């Protein structure tokens, strides 16, 4: 049996942790990154409110959805017409629908990757609404330092597209209890990665701990030696560069599917 290391940010990992516990799987949270709001909150809020006149908003993650609605606050009730809102997967769709209900926002069109395509930027770009050459205005809501494939592809297709960073990814604090749990585990490790940023941040955090904390300093080689479940080929390539060997790409980013696949891999 493997110990599952969940590197998702704490703000988005509760459902997965609960699913893993219900399956009676040994698991520990070791977030690679945390989510923070923008540094210039008022400026970003003003830009966001001005952008309600645009045709489409694209949320690149659940974090983008949560931070956007946090920035909108009471302003959502004062606006009668909203752009079409696009998401990359079913988890994000459910999250967006929940926030729309909470804010009393009705009649908002939601688009997502069509059936049979991946829950990703590439999948969303296959949607017919984003295939047509158009001068529609599109706002991509994300964090600094992400991929620019969406932006460049939409601009190449003739859309008037721009980005707005509504949140930041910052390194998470290493929790001593989590470090100790992994250090004390005598068996193999199975790590879930949900972003390339988490991989880089956690590597930096654990390498920086070499001198200050001997236990934490030993973790990175052990983690790399174990098994890995990644969400994308991009994460797989990065893990290979960091000397990971056994890397499986998840069938789906959906929480229940991840829990089921982790259960299968943990018992293998």
Regions found by a protein language model. Give the residues of each.
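Conserved beta-alpha
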Residues: 1-268
